[in-house]
A protein has these predicted regions:
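Terminal helix-turn-helix DNA-binding modules in bacterial transcription factors
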Residues: 11-19, 24-29, 47-86, 108-122
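Short helix-capping and inter-helix turn/linker motifs at the boundaries of alpha-helical repeat units
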Residues: 4-8
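Long, charge-rich low-complexity segments
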Residues: 29-36
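Short hydrophobic/aromatic patch on the recognition helix
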Residues: 40-41, 45, 90-91, 95
Length: 122
């Protein structure tokens, strides 16, 4: 169990990450924003959410992108750009790593039993 102050820090960082999914945030930037060391942010966040802030942010981005792929006709590259990816292949790799299939396969409605069902909650 983590001290309440560390839980609160992790929750504040998580909320901030959710509000800034379109940005590329580093742990150093989070440390500066929250007045804590990068080590404290990483350990607190990992203790509460079971993953690093970077992995959490990536999961949030990919699940947001997955929703847009299914609900809009926007291009994969356009959606990638909304979430801070200017390189389609890097976006596709991140999407595949998190969701389990390529963006195009996901959009086409492939049977996705092994796909990650939802983003980690804050």
């Amino acid at each position: 169990s983590y001290p309440q102050s560390q839980v609160q820090l992790a929750e504040q960082v998580g909320a901030y990450l959710l509000e800034n999914t379109e940005r590329r945030l580093t742990v150093a930037e989070l440390a500066q924003r929250f007045g804590a060391s990068a080590t404290l942010i990483n350990s607190s966040f990992r203790g509460v959410y079971g993953m690093s802030p970077a992995a959490f942010l990536r999961a949030q981005k990919m699940h947001g992108a997955a929703r847009l792929l299914r609900q809009t006709d926007r291009t994969v590259l356009d959606i990638a750009g909304q979430f801070g990816y200017d390189n389609g292949s890097k976006f596709a790799k991140a999407f595949r790593d998190v969701i389990g299939v390529s963006p195009n396969a996901y959009r086409s409605g492939i049977d996705c039993d092994s796909c990650a069902p939802e983003a980690p909650a804050v």
